[in-house]
């Protein structure tokens, strides 16, 4: 899989990360801000710790003792947070989906950016293939117990590029004289 986390081993990065849910916000304005407001309302009052990565420039802020808001985050820190398998709320863009698969992440609420037909398609496809939840931005966010109680298929992200190259080399060497 092509992922910014390809150099990190999934599930072995962190035993200390406290977040039960992480929102990764992205997309054009005003859609990004509308999703942020919806996520903030949803996270308010939920038990446990939440992390919101806003994907904008500026100083980091924190809403309260249970919600940390960062404008940006480095790859290693994010991969550590995601490796603990919190519920992830994110857009269904290709790069984000590849990151989730690489880390063998099993609990995600995919929210395609309105008007982005590729994200709508990918969100629906990944919901069918991997058991993720996919909703429109205008819809209510799901009850977390439903996500936590669901039985998700085991993801086998692997390194598809490396495996494909190995198969190609193996096939071509067996045909060589």
Report each predicted region and the residues it spans.
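Short acidic-hydrophobic, aromatic-tinged amphipathic segments that line or gate anion-handling sites
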Residues: 2, 68-73, 131-140
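C-terminal amphipathic helix plus adjacent low-complexity
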Residues: 144-177
């Amino acid at each position: 899989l092509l992922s910014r986390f390809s150099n990190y081993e999934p599930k072995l990065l962190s035993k200390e990360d406290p977040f039960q849910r992480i929102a990764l916000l992205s997309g054009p304005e005003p859609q990004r801000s509308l999703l942020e407001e919806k996520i903030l309302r949803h996270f308010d009052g939920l038990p446990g710790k939440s992390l919101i990565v806003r994907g904008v420039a500026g100083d980091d802020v924190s809403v309260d003792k249970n919600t940390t808001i960062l404008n940006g985050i480095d790859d290693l820190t994010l991969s550590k947070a995601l490796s603990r398998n919190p519920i992830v709320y994110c857009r269904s863009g290709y790069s984000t989906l590849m990151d989730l698969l690489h880390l063998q992440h099993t609990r995600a609420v995919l929210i395609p950016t309105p008007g982005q037909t590729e994200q709508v398609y990918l969100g629906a496809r990944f919901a069918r293939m991997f058991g993720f939840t996919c909703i429109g931005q205008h819809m209510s966010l799901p009850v977390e117990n439903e996500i936590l109680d669901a039985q998700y298929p085991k993801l086998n992200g692997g390194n598809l590029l490396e495996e494909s190259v190995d198969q190609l080399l193996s096939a071509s060497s067996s045909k060589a004289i």
